[in-house]
């Protein structure tokens, strides 16, 4: 099991394949994505790597985190994410991951925070059909209707779909295809839409349902810290 990467959503565009068909893609950018810490079975009881991405001003970084970054000899990061990995896929601290970590044609799982929509009704939030246009219905055409049963249970069931806050939730979209990568510019082009707004942090992993393709680099496609 390999590590994933932390990327930033740039936006959407389209590219053309060899047949001249256009493919809608989301552009993800890797910015200064480095290994900040390791978790080992002997010391922590599990195996993982902690990645950091982006840049944060020193004055805005808590003192404890400054020491954490200094121990890894990396500059303060804007985003930290921990990835579970197998023991043979541990990555050296300070190494920088590149867009070549993924190969064209492979499937990935993408996690992000969806765009917040504020308070929304049942029709917009859950695709309800609403009430009838006439025949006794007035002023409540877009309401969700009955929410309960009878004297028993005498309450509204937990999880009942009703109006409420829509969006701004952690969502994972599975099995998105990597159309292409640009290692020099740190870009990953993923087919289709990715949850989150422009500029938001996105976590990209090998698709759990399809596994890691044979051509993917192990333990990762890295650029050694000292070569920068």
Swiss-Prot record:
Protein name: Large ribosomal subunit protein uL3
PTM comment, free text: Methylated by PrmB.
Organism: Sinorhizobium medicae (strain WSM419)
Record PROSITE patterns: RIBOSOMAL_L3 (PS00474)
Keywords for this protein: Methylation, Ribonucleoprotein, Ribosomal protein, RNA-binding, rRNA-binding
GO cellular component: cytosolic large ribosomal subunit
One BP annotation, GO: translation
Quaternary structure and interacting proteins, as annotated: Part of the 50S ribosomal subunit. Forms a cluster with proteins L14 and L19.
Highest taxon of the lineage: Bacteria
Gene coding for it: rplC
Protein function: One of the primary rRNA binding proteins, it binds directly near the 3'-end of the 23S rRNA, where it nucleates assembly of the 50S subunit.
The keyword Ribonucleoprotein belongs to this UniProt entry's keyword annotation: yes
Keyword ATP-binding assigned: no
Species lineage: Bacteria, Pseudomonadati, Pseudomonadota, Alphaproteobacteria, Hyphomicrobiales
GO MF term set: rRNA binding; structural constituent of ribosome
Modification type N5-methylglutamine: residues: 151
InterPro entries xrefs: Ribosomal_uL3 (IPR000597), Ribosomal_uL3_bac/org-type (IPR019927), Ribosomal_uL3_CS (IPR019926), Transl_B-barrel_sf (IPR009000)
UniProt family annotation: Belongs to the universal ribosomal protein uL3 family.
Pfam families documented for this protein: Ribosomal_L3
């Amino acid at each position: 099991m390999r590590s994933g990467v932390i990327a930033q959503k740039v936006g959407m565009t389209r590219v053309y394949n060899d047949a001249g068909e256009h493919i809608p893609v989301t552009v993800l950018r890797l910015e200064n994505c480095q290994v900040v810490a390791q978790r080992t079975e002997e010391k922590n009881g599990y195996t993982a790597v902690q990645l950091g991405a982006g840049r944060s001003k020193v004055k805005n970084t808590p003192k404890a985190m400054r020491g954490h970054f200094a121990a890894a000899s990396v500059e303060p990061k804007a985003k930290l994410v921990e990835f579970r990995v197998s023991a043979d896929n541990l990555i050296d601290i300070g190494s920088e991951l590149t867009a070549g970590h993924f190969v064209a044609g492979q499937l990935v799982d993408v996690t992000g925070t969806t765009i917040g929509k504020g308070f929304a009704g049942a029709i917009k939030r859950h695709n309800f059909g609403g009430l009838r246009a006439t025949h006794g219905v007035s002023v409540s055409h877009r309401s969700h209707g009955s929410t309960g049963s009878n004297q028993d249970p005498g309450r509204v069931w937990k999880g009942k779909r009703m109006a409420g806050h829509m969006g701004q939730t952690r969502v994972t979209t599975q099995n998105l295809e990597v159309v292409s990568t640009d290692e020099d510019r740190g870009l990953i082009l993923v087919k289709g839409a990715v949850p989150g707004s422009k500029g938001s942090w996105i976590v990209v992993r090998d698709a759990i349902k399809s596994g890691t393709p044979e051509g993917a680099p192990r333990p990762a496609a890295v650029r050694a810290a000292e070569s920068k």
